[in-house]
């Protein structure tokens, strides 16, 4: 067993320039989405950086990082929110003359999502809720 310590990685002009040029080359060859995901991993390995996050941070401070145009979906959950259910149910209640204002049903947002889904299915508006949520 040896007590030799490995040198910690530190950004300098040389490895910063290498990271920037590799990043730009990856964008040209493989596109922005690849460069911003697997490309950052490749750059981290090539320059010896601790992580792709470190590379992204350095590219950002060097004003070389390009943010992707399309939004990423984070998490695996549904994009349907309680507000979508309440809006659609309230719209139908107003159209039917049952209530005058959507605020009359605002307290429905405190119900569980599964409960609102069951009510929407019962009322036959579940597909409309999905459309309102953009699914």
From Swiss-Prot:
The keyword DNA-binding applies. The keyword Aminoacyl-tRNA synthetase does not apply. Keywords: DNA-binding, Early protein. It comes from the Viruses. One of its GO terms (molecular function) is DNA binding. Induction: Expressed pre-early in the viral replicative cycle. Expressed with a few other proteins from the first step transfer (FST) DNA. FST DNA corresponds to the first small portion of the genome that enters into the host cell at the beginning of infection before pausing. Involved, together with A1 protein, in the second step transfer (SST) which allows the completion of viral DNA into the host cell. This gene is part of the long terminal repeats present at both ends of the viral genome and is thus duplicated. Interacts with A1 protein; the two proteins form heterooligomers. Belongs to the T5likevirus A2 protein family. This is Protein A2. The gene is A2.
């Amino acid at each position: 067993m040896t007590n030799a310590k490995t040198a910690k990685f530190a950004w300098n002009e040389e490895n910063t320039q290498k990271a920037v040029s590799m990043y730009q080359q990856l964008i040209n060859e493989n596109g922005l989405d690849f460069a911003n995901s697997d490309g950052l991993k490749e750059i981290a390995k090539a320059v010896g950086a601790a992580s792709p996050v470190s590379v992204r941070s350095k590219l950002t401070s060097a004003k070389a990082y390009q943010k992707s145009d399309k939004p990423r979906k984070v998490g695996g959950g549904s994009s349907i929110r309680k507000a979508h259910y309440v809006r659609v149910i309230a719209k139908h209640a107003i159209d039917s003359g049952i209530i005058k204002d959507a605020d009359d049903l605002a307290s429905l947002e405190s119900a569980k999502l599964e409960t609102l889904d069951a009510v929407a299915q019962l009322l036959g508006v579940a597909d409309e809720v999905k459309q309102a949520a953009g699914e």
